[in-house]
């Protein structure tokens, strides 16, 4: 099997404006889904997501996208950040969104346009 470069991408803890971070892992197996990729740790103190004395954070793959720069079978991996114990990290806003999306998945979305007109006699 040929080797594939997977770029793990996540949102850091910078305030007031978070930034994107990434690091690359090389795998030698086929990746069809984000579930085919392992969780990966990182030092949260360098991304303002943890204190220096207990800085382990965890990246969990959530989506894969074909890498438009490297091409081939290489992938971009969109990740969420978790604490080392597996709990949701405070910088992980997407986890709450997933929870709400699951809760309301059977609801229908409706969108409409309201057009207002004014007639003025001059």
Question: In which residue ranges do the predicted regions lie?
Answer:
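ATP/Mg2+-dependent ligation/transfer catalytic cores
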Residues: 1-120
């Amino acid at each position: 099997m040929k080797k594939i470069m997977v770029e793990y991408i996540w949102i850091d803890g910078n305030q007031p404006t978070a930034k994107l971070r990434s690091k690359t892992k090389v795998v030698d197996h086929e990746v069809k889904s984000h579930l085919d990729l392992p969780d990966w740790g990182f030092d949260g103190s360098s991304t303002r997501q943890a204190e220096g004395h207990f800085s382990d954070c965890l990246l969990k793959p959530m989506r894969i996208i074909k890498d438009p720069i490297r091409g081939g079978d290489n992938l971009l991996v969109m990740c969420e950040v978790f604490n080392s114990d597996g709990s949701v990290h405070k910088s992980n806003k997407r986890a709450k969104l997933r929870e709400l999306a699951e809760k309301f998945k059977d609801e229908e979305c409706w969108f409409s346009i309201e057009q207002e007109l004014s007639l003025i006699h001059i």
